[in-house]
């Protein structure tokens, strides 16, 4: 049935429609094509860019205006205007916030139902305690704080530490399952570097891992190791093929978290490359370098620490502005969610 043949609310008698509303019901057909459009989703997510040079001063001012005791986490949320600023979504299922912690501050121990990660943007001396292990937070590091796992933050260095929070909060909130619980101070019961030492070399596992599968065995992915792996992978990747590595569970090869996927991209000097068009939405964060991105018909120049929203079903082309140095990007997407729901698609 074509859109033109669908009835409208105006076609219905006024008293009939008012009776439907009084009974907490509505007719589907007037809005059917809004919720089930032809061909592809009627996307509300816009390909917005948040420039770190614009957001950082406001984040630092938040540090002056609001003590951490009154904020729990001092965060500025990246809000996509297409989804409504008040909904605090960067895409339909992904939340992104930039969090500031100052020297000597701590964020109390807690756990929550949404899946979350921290990706460090700047600063030294920050740390996260997760599951009894103290994880240092250095620029570009990815720290997992899975659903229901205790974690707390602190800062033992100088100057501000800023990281990017990525959560599936819109999804969990949308199904009325979002909550958090405060806890007592964590006890350190693991030596520093335990999880990264256990899974340092690709293809090698602790022998005991052969008889068990841990949901979240690796909680910290150091950027220096990821960066080096990208360089080595680029050396054996033909020109014209995307240099992209996925963050995975080293025991199972599955994605790190149930609903969100994470990957790192290296754009070789002077490279322009098109990403696969997919059903999943995503977020790109610039770790090092500068360049430009075209999302459908929208073009943005980007530089270090900028963050960009990628709508579902979008055509994305990335370009490195440098002819001599690589550019590195961190990507968050909801492909794991799409796969579990049976709706994941890759388009030619």
Curated annotation (Swiss-Prot):
Partially inhibited by Na(+), Ca(2+) or Mn(2+) at concentrations of 5 mM. Presence of 5 mM of Zn(2+), Hg(2+) or EDTA results in more than 95% inhibition. Induction: Strictly inducible. Induced by 3-hydroxybenzoate and gentisate. Pfam families: Cupin_2. Optimum temperature is 25 degrees Celsius. GO terms for biological process: catabolic process. Optimum pH is 7.0-8.0. Residues 97-165 form the Cupin type-2 domain. It catalyses: 2,5-dihydroxybenzoate + O2 = 3-maleylpyruvate + H(+). Keywords: Aromatic hydrocarbons catabolism, Dioxygenase, Iron, Oxidoreductase. Its cofactor is Fe(2+). InterPro entries: Cupin_2, GDO-like, RmlC-like_jellyroll, RmlC_Cupin_sf. Its EC number is 1.13.11.4. GO terms for molecular function: gentisate 1,2-dioxygenase activity. PANTHER family: 1,2-DIOXYGENASE PROTEIN-RELATED (PTHR41517), CUPIN (PTHR41517:SF1). Belongs to the gentisate 1,2-dioxygenase family. Homotetramer. Involved in the degradation of gentisate. Catalyzes the conversion of gentisate (2,5-dihydroxybenzoate) to maleylpyruvate. Can also use other substrates such as 3-bromogentisate, 3-fluorogentisate, 3-isopropylgentisate, 3-methylgentisate and 3-ethylgentisate, but is unable to utilize gentisate that is substituted at the carbon-4 position. This is Gentisate 1,2 dioxygenase 2. It comes from Aquipseudomonas alcaligenes (Pseudomonas alcaligenes).
């Amino acid at each position: 049935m074509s859109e033109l043949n669908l009835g409208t609310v105006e076609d219905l008698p006024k008293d009939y429609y008012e009776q439907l509303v009084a009974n907490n019901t509505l007719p589907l057909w007037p809005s059917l094509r809004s919720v089930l459009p032809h061909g592809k989703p009627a996307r509300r997510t816009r390909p917005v860019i948040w420039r770190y040079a614009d957001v950082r001063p406001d984040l630092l001012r938040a540090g002056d205006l609001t003590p951490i005791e009154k904020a729990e986490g001092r965060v500025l949320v990246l809000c996509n205007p297409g989804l409504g600023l008040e909904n605090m979504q960067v895409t339909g299922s992904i939340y992104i916030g930039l969090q500031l912690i100052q020297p000597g501050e701590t964020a109390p121990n807690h756990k929550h139902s949404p899946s979350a990660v921290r990706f460090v943007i700047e600063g030294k001396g920050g740390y996260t305690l997760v599951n009894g292990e103290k994880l240092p937070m250095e620029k570009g590091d990815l720290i997992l704080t899975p659903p229901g796992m205790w974690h707390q933050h602190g800062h033992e260095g100088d100057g501000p530490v800023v990281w990017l929070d990525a959560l599936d909060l819109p999804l969990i909130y949308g199904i009325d399952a979002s909550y958090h619980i405060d806890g007592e101070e964590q006890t350190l019961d693991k030596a520093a570097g335990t999880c990264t030492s256990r899974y340092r070399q690709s293809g090698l596992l602790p022998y005991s891992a052969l008889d068990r599968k841990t949901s979240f065995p690796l909680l910290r992915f150091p950027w220096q190791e990821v960066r080096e792996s990208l360089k080595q992978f680029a050396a054996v990747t033909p020109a014209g093929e995307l240099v992209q590595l996925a963050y995975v569970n080293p025991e199972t090869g599955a994605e790190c978290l149930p609903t969100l996927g994470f990957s790192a991209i290296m754009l070789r000097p002077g490279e322009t490359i098109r990403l696969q068009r997919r059903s999943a939405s995503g977020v790109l964060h610039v770790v090092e370098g500068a360049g430009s991105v075209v999302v459908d018909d929208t073009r943005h120049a980007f530089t270090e620490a900028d963050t960009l929203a990628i709508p579902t079903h979008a055509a994305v082309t990335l370009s490195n502005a440098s002819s001599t140095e690589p550019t590195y990007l961190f990507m968050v997407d909801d492909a794991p969610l799409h796969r579990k729901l049976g709706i994941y698609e890759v388009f030619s």
